[in-house]
Amino acid sequence: MISRIWHGWTTPANADKYEALLKEEIFVGIQNRRIRGFKGIQLLRREVGEEVEFVTIMLFDSLDAVRKFAGEDYEVAVVPEKAKAVLSHFDERSQHYEVRAERGGEG
């Protein structure tokens, strides 16, 4: 399993707008592509000083599945123009990690 991690930052004034864009358009668009090997996506958010940081964590079966999503140079960040319009800055490249262990909680 491969975890693809990416960070983007925006202003507090644009944070809710960006979150809605992710959840209502961008994530839906990714799901609608029906990429074989795409397992899901998480969205994290926190305030950092005068900015709001967002982190996306995508899970894929393999690097081949990541390439189906991002292209041959799979580390390049996939940032739609609508997102660029509300972000103040963002990672140009995503980080990829092998998921080596995963455990559930008590709940």
Language-model features: locations:
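Short, well-ordered beta-strand segments in beta-rich or mixed alpha/beta enzyme
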Residues: S3-W9, G40-Y74
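Acidic/proline-rich low-complexity IDRs
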Residues: A20-L21, L43, M58, V86
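Glycine-rich loops and low-complexity Gly/Arg-rich segments
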Residues: G29-R34, A65-F69, P80-A85, R93-S94
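Glycine-rich beta-strand-turn "strand-cap" elements at beta-sheet edges
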Residues: K39-V52, V78-G107
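Short amphipathic alpha-helical segments
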Residues: N14-G40, A77-K82
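Short acidic, gly/pro-rich beta-turn/loop elements at beta-sheet edges
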Residues: D16-Y18, E51, V66-K68, G104-E106
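Non-catalytic surface loops within mature trypsin-like serine protease
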Residues: P12, F60-S62, E98-A101
